[in-house]
Amino acid sequence: MWQVKRALSGQCQTLLGVLLLSAALIIHSAQIGGAAKAQPRLEPGVGEVNSAEAVNENGRGNVARRLPRSVFHVRWNPNEKFVVESRESPAINSSKLAPHPRLKVSKNTKLTLSPKLYLCHDKYSELCHNKTQQFRQRIVQTFEKSMSESFNDSQPNPYHVDYKPVFGDSFEEQYYPSTCLVMEAGVRVLRRKDKPFDKVPFGRLFPRQKLFRNIKNIKTCAIVSSAGSLAGSKLGRFIDTHDIVMRFNHAPTQGHEVDVGSKTTIRVVNSQVVTKPEFDFAHAPIFRNVTIAAWDPGKYNGTLEDWLTSADYDLFSNYEIYRRRYPKSRAFLIDPHSVWRLWQTLQMFAGNRSIRRNPPSSGFIGLALLLPHCPQVDFVEYIPSTRLNGRCHYYSKEMNAACTFGSWHPLAAEKLMTLDMNTADDMSVFQFGILRIRRPDKLLCGFNFFGY
C-alpha cells in the first residue's frame, strides 16, 4: 500500500513538473513575441520618399532604431497609388508671368548665421542630432529677437488695432493649446447668406459650393510656402502625395516640379495680387482651374460694409471680372473679421509681448483656413531648414532675410506659434523642411475665446 502511494506521488510530481515547464515555455514565447511586435519600424527619410531607397548617408541599409515622430513614412502597399491625383486640373503657370508683390520689408537683407554649418542627413548620428539641435536653437533665438524688436508704441497703426486681452491679467491665455486657438479663430470664406451680402448684388458672385469637395476623403494636406529654401529641396514628389496642396499668390510650379511638385488644389492670394495690373488676376492661367481664396484685412473693428468701400486694395472689381469671366470657378473671399481673430490668437500666444499691429501673413491664414478640414497638415519650408539661403522666394533671386524672419507681418510670432503646434521631430523640421500639425480633438478645444 505504501509503495502504491509512493508511485502515485511520483507521478504527480512528474506531472507537476511538466506543467511548470510548459507554463515557462509559454511565458517565454509570449515575451519573444511581444519583443518582436515592439520592434520599432524603420521610417524612410526624404531621400527615400523621392527615390524609394532605404540607404542612409553612410550607406547602411538596415538600422536598428528610428527617430520618433518622423514625418516621412511610406506604406509599401502595392494596391495603393503612391502619387494621389489631384481633383483639380493642374494650373498652367510660369514664374515669368508677373513680378512678385512689393511688400514692406526691413533693410536687413543678410543672414546672421551660416546654415551649411548645421547641414546633415544621418538622423541616427549623434553628431547630426547635435547639429540639428544647435540650428533649432539659433532659429528660435532669431525669431525671439525679431519679436522683441518688432513693436513699439511709436509705430503707425493703420488698421486701428485696439486689442484687449480676453481675460486680462487673471488668465494665462498662452497656456491654451495653440492648435485650439487657431481652430477657434474660425478663419472662413464669405457666403451669400452673410450680411450685408445677402442683400447686395455683389453677394451673388460668391460660389454656392463649399470651399473643399469630398471633405470626408481628405486625409493629408500640404501647404507649400514660397520660401527660397525650397530651391534644391527635391520635395516635389512628397508634396504631390497629399490630398490637398495649397500654394500662395502666383508662386509657380512649372519649371520647379522637382522641388515643389506640380499639384495645386487651392491658392491663397492677397489683395495686392488680385488688384495690381502686373499680376493680371482675371486672365493669367496660373489662377485658373484651382480654388482661389483671396483676402484683404480691412480695419480691425470695421464692419463688412466699411470693408466694401475702404479695403486695403480694391480687390472687388477684379474679383467680379474673374467670377463673371469664369462663372463655374471656385473663387472665394476670406472674411476679414476672421483674419483679425487669427491675429488675436497670435497676441494671445505672445502673452505680455506685443506683436506687430498688422494682419497675419498669407501662410498663417492658409493654415487656419485648412486645418479644420484636414486631419494632418504638412507645412513645407515655413520654418526654415538648413537649406536656408537668404532668398525671398524659390522662383526669384531677391535676397532678404526679412522674408523669412519678418518685418511687416507678425511673422516671428506666427512661426513660433506654428513650432508650438508641430508634432514632427526636429530632423524633419530643420533638416528636411517639413513641419507637421495635427487637427486637435474637439474635446481638447471648445473654450470659444472669441464668442462669434
Give the residues covered by each predicted segment.
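Metal-ion/cofactor- or nucleotide/acyl-coenzyme-handling active-site neighborhoods
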Residues: 2-452
